[in-house]
């Protein structure tokens, strides 16, 4: 590991030298890329410097322990430095784990009502609200792409982009089947029903990241509609794109113009095609092996929201919280942190 860390320090110093040259900003795109790389390496370099300082503090304390008057003080210094060194070693192991290249990207989130009829649509709306409130807490913005509402205020399907640095790194664990247990608003008998909704989270890819042949795309236009099929505008501004080779269909009706809706559709299509390619590569390399914690299979039940008990349980890490109201209001960092920690532990195990 020390050799890896020294290589990181050497690379960081090289990038620092380049950034100080007079012509560094001659190519702004290249400069921005190098600065991002430098910023990514900086936490590793700082932690390694602190690790080496702790190591030196231990050596200095050991040398002075032979002096009876200094022994007690040096023993305290040595113990503190040793504990810091061990803590920094663990931190460096995590910092050296391969980074997901998409972690800093925006995300496209797709929510679909699943088993449970109108109640599943109402739950899908609750999930949409939960993620929207979480995004607001992070200072991120939500950009609607497609929102198909039911007459009772539920959501058949909701597609939206969350714009914010690191959005994918936090929300990638949300893909899967979410299960709700509660007394439906439509139920007069007071019986608890079980319903589901599915969530898919994709890193937002630009068209430049994915090669799309325009001849492979069929574009359809239609009128945007609201709940119950009510037209919300009188022009055919909504856009549906069909990628003929893969059969992928994407739609957007939230913008006022065809051009804007088509642009959003292309962003979604690029992300979906990228995901297919990544899944293909993953299956070739791992033989379809999936870790216990990760982005989650879409047909995997990942979490249960039990309203009568006020309980939320994430089945992947066995975490149960008895504060369902705050979770539904977007307070999901504790769940995400537990999933990220478990993901790191899994990667560390596979890295050794």
Residues covered by each model-derived region:
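Ribosome-associated translation termination/rescue signal centered on the conserved GGQ peptidyl-tRNA hydrolysis loop
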Residues: 87-352
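Charged, heptad-repeat coiled-coil alpha-helices that serve as long linker/dimerization "arms"
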Residues: 1-107, 345-352
């Amino acid at each position: 590991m020390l050799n890896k860390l020294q290589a990181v320090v050497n690379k960081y110093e090289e990038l620092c030298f380049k950034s100080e040259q007079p012509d560094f900003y001659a190519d702004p795109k290249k400069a921005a890329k190098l600065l991002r790389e430098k910023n990514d390496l900086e936490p590793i370099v700082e932690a390694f410097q602190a690790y080496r300082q702790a190591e030196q503090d231990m050596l200095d304390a050991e040398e002075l322990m032979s002096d009876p008057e200094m022994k007690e003080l040096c023993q305290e210094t040595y113990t503190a430095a040793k504990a810091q060194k061990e803590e920094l070693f663990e931190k460096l192991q995590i910092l050296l784990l391969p980074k997901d290249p998409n972690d800093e990207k925006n995300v496209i989130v797709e929510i679909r009502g699943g088993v449970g009829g109108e109640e599943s649509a109402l739950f899908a709306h609750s999930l949409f609200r939960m993620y929207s409130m979480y995004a607001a807490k992070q200072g991120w913005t939500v950009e609607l792409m497609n929102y198909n509402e039911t007459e009772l205020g539920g959501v058949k399907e909701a597609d939206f982009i969350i714009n914010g640095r690191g959005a994918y790194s936090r929300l990638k664990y949300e893909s899967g089947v979410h299960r709700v247990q509660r007394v439906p608003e439509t139920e007069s008998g007071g019986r608890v029903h079980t319903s589901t909704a599915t969530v898919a989270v994709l890193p937002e890819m630009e068209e430049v990241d994915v090669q799309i042949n325009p001849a492979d795309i069929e574009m359809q236009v239609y009128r945007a509609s609201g709940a119950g099929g009510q037209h919300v505008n009188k022009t055919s501004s909504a856009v549906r794109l069909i990628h003929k080779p893969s059969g992928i269909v994407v739609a957007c009706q939230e913008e006022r113009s065809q051009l804007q809706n088509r642009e959003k559709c292309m962003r979604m299509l690029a992300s979906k095609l990228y995901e297919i390619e990544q899944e293909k590569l993953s299956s070739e390399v791992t033989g379809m092996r999936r870790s216990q914690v990760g982005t989650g299979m879409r047909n995997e039940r990942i979490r249960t929201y039990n309203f009568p008990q006020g309980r939320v349980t994430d089945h992947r890490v066995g975490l149960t919280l008895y504060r369902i109201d705050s979770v539904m209001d977007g307070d999901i960092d504790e769940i995400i942190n537990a999933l990220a920690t478990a993901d790191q532990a899994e990667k560390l195990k596979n890295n050794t």
